[in-house]
Amino acid sequence: MKEIKNIIIKIERFQSKKLKFFKENLMENKKNSVIERFAKKGVFPYQFALTLLIPIRNIFLSPQKLIERLELKEGDNVLEVGAGPGYFSLKVAKFLKNGRLTLADIQQEMLDIAKKRLAKRKVSNSEYYLCNGTKFEIEDNKFDVIYMVTVLGEIENQKEYIGEFYRMLKPNGILSISEQGGDPDKMSVEEIEELLKDFNFEFYKLYGTKNNFTI
């Protein structure tokens, strides 16, 4: 009950920021394509970035719960793919007291928002990487953990990306994929398993339900 009250309070504080955000980014932007992309499949438009920071998301998957599922260690080197405005990034970076978090996204505007958000909270162990949609210009065996939340379905060349994840992970590294109901790009557990079968990943754990899960 206390957690629900806290969420309600945070949502109330969120409202004024949200109204200002929509006025600046949507009311002045008359392009229907941006609004259409909000509810359709594909890359989530940065113009709606603030909606990804709404506290009610904690009900489905909080940053703290994700950290537990990732089994992170304080010294890990971690890559977040599709970081967006940094909803999960802030707490993950703070947890990595002796490690580093690289935030990757295909939209520079999203990275700019995340960078500003983390800098405001004095986070200094983060890096930012703009994806080009194909290869990652990152060395082999760099990361202990690579994770993404409601992102995989947005990627067009999924197998190429999975191959890149495998290359960038250290031996015995973890690739974590989370999906949530209501996302138009949501993939099922079975679809993800089918996608991964051509690579040398071993299934480790399934958290949550088939509608909202982390593997």
Language model regions located:
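Class I SAM-dependent methyltransferase Rossmann-like catalytic core
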Residues: 38-60
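Conserved alpha-helix/loop element of class I SAM-dependent methyltransferases that forms part
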Residues: 57-75
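Class I SAM-dependent methyltransferase SAM/SAH-binding core
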Residues: 79-81, 85-135
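Helix-to-beta-strand junctions that scaffold the AdoMet/dcAdoMet cofactor pocket
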Residues: 96-97, 155-156, 169-171
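A short acidic, Gly/Pro-enriched loop at the edge of an enzyme's catalytic core
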Residues: 134-146
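A short SAM/SAH-binding and catalytic strip from SAM-dependent methyltransferases
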Residues: 144-157
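A short glycine-rich, Lys/Arg-flanked "PGG" loop and its adjoining helix->strand segment in the class I
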Residues: 159-174
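Conserved class I S-adenosyl-L-methionine
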Residues: 176-199
